[in-house]
C-alpha cells in the first residue's frame, strides 16, 4: 500500500498524532511570540502540517526545519510545504545527516527537536549521536520529542536519553496506534515522550 500524503490511513495517523502531541506538549510549552522546531529524519515531512498547527496554537509565528539524508524525500517536502502552510508558519527542508548537526549552522537553536519513529535499535551509535547533538542544539528550555513504533525500542531510546542527562517530563502510550504487519509488535506512533535538557 502506497503511503502518499493523501492516503486515508496516513490522515488518520496524523489526526491521532496531533491529539497526542497536543496533550503531551501543552503543559511544557508556554505561549511566546515565535517557535522554532527541528524535525530530524523527517522524510517527506508528512507531519509538517500537524506540527505547524500545534506551534501556532502557542506562538504568533513558527518556523519548521526538516532534515533527512534522502534527497528525493527532502525535495518532495520542499515542493509541498513551502506552498501549503498558513501565512504564520514557514518551513524549509535540508538534506543532511542528523548525527552531524554540529556542522550545520543554518538550524540555529530550536525550541523543539522532533523525531518521529526514531530508529534507535537500527544503529545505536548513530542514534546516540543524533540524540546527543539534538539536545546540544536545543534552546536552554528546549524540548526533545520522540515517537516510536516498538515497545522495546522506545525503552532503549528513553534509557539512552536519560543516560545523556535528558529528563523525561511526559509520555503517552497511544491507544489508537494503527498496527502494521511488516514486523511483530510494530504500530504507528505507539509511544510518545518529551524530554527536557538536564
Segments predicted by a language model, with ranges:
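Class I SAM-dependent methyltransferase Rossmann-like catalytic core
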Residues: 1-28
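Glycine-rich SAM-binding Motif I of class I
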Residues: 45-49
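Class I SAM-dependent methyltransferase SAM/SAH-binding core
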Residues: 51-92
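A short acidic, Gly/Pro-enriched loop at the edge of an enzyme's catalytic core
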Residues: 103-113
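A short SAM/SAH-binding and catalytic strip from SAM-dependent methyltransferases
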Residues: 111-125
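A short glycine-rich, Lys/Arg-flanked "PGG" loop and its adjoining helix->strand segment in the class I
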Residues: 127-140
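Conserved beta-strand signature within the Rossmann-like core of class I S-adenosyl-L-methionine
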Residues: 141-149
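Class I S-adenosyl-L-methionine
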Residues: 164-198
Amino acid at each position: 500500500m502506497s503511503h502518499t500524503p493523501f492516503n486515508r490511513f496516513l490522515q488518520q495517523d496524523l489526526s491521532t498524532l496531533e491529539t497526542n502531541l497536543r496533550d503531551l506538549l501543552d503543559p511544557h510549552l508556554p505561549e511566546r511570540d515565535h517557535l522554532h522546531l527541528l524535525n530530524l529524519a523527517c522524510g517527506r515531512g508528512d507531519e509538517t502540517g500537524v506540527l505547524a498547527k500545534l506551534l501556532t496554537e502557542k506562538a504568533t509565528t513558527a518556523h519548521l526545519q526538516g532534515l533527512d539524508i534522502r534527497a528525493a524525500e527532502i525535495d518532495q517536502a520542499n515542493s509541498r510545504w513551502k506552498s501549503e502552510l498558513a501565512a504564520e508558519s514557514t518551513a524549509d527542508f535540508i538534506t543532511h545527516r542528523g548525527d552531524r548537526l554540529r556542522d550545520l549552522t543554518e538550524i540555529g537553536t530550536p525550541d523543539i527537536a522532533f523525531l518521529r519513529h526514531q530508529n534507535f535499535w537500527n544503529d545505536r551509535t548513530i542514534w546516540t549521536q543524533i540524540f546527543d547533538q539534538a539536545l546540544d542544539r536545543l534552546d536552554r528550555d528546549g524540548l526533545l520529542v520522540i515517537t516510536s513504533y516498538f515497545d522495546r525500542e522506545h525503552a532503549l531510546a528513553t534509557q539512552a536519553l536519560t543516560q545523556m542527562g535528558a529528563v523525561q517530563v511526559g509520555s503517552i502510550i497511544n491507544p489508537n496506534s494503527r498496527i502494521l504487519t511488516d514486523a511483530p509488535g510494530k504500530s504507528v506512533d505507539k509511544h510518545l515522550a518529551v524530554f527536557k535538557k538536564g
